Amino acid sequence: MTDQLPASTLRLALVVGGLVLSLLLGFGVGRLNSGPSSAAGSALAAGGDHTHPPGAGEPGVGGLAVTSAGYTLTPLGGEFAAGRAGEFRFQIRDAGQRPVTRFAIVHDRPLHLIVVRRDLSGFQHLHPGMAADGTWSVPLTLPQPGVWRAYADFTAVTADGTQVPVTLGVDLVAPGGYVPRPLPAADRQATVDGFTVGYEGSPAIGVDVPVRFRVRAGATTPTLEPYLGAYGHLVVLREGDLGYLHVHPDTELAGDAVAFQLTVPGPGRYRLYFDFQVAGQVRTAEFTLSVP
């Protein structure tokens, strides 16, 4: 007669065996699941883009948000009467809402303030002063009623010395009847105060393209003076959302031309504002660029 285990002993053996099998399967599944997940997480942490965005949205397009990269543009008041001299006061605050007071000097200034109406008219390039408490202030006149966009373009310096370039944007309002001006047609030549300015180069989507500006005064070539660390300064704004494109200038003249490297993020129309200095006076030539 064959020996048989008691029923209770058999049940206990089955339970223990099931537990052991579950543990072994769980260990194997855990090894399979944890390996790739850990590797992916490490790759994201180590290989992610550590360059802070200039604002929000596409790479190279800034000024679309009031907060980005842990910094916030905080106006201290913002009521303006069209055509009346006023003052714009603001702070750049960190993630803890503390005013930032350490900025790197970029293009000869710690902060550049660009102001333009939403129809891309009335361009102003200003350089505010900062008080010890981190409050920036600058005289500002909004000449026409409407909604205006103010851009703060700066590079903050963190406690460990890291430099964080950011461009933030905020709307300012001058109450009154707003009549938008149509954007001028695309043209490679503009005239300002007797100077004729033209540019060469055909910006393409996603490609760094050289763009060169030449200034003429009648039949002569005026002597361009250094301005903001180069021989000219270029701001490019996108029609529609007023995205602010970052442009890299060449510090030296290319013959008699002022050269920049420009990348456009997509099709549409853009407004180019080229600042140049002659005989101590800064002027701005404006162009419309159409990208198919």
Spans of features found by a protein language model:
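Beta-strand-rich structural segments
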Residues: 85-98, 150-152, 207-220
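Residue-level recognition of secondary-structure-to-loop junctions
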Residues: 130, 137-144, 264-266, 276
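Aromatic sugar-binding surface patches on proteins
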Residues: 122, 131-137, 253-259
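Exposed beta-strand face motif in extracellular beta-rich ectodomains
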Residues: 146-150, 268-272
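The feature marks the first
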Residues: 68-132, 140
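Hydrophobic membrane-insertion alpha-helices, especially the h-region
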Residues: 14-28
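Extracytoplasmic/periplasmic copper-protein system
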Residues: 2-3, 28-80, 155-205, 209-216, ...
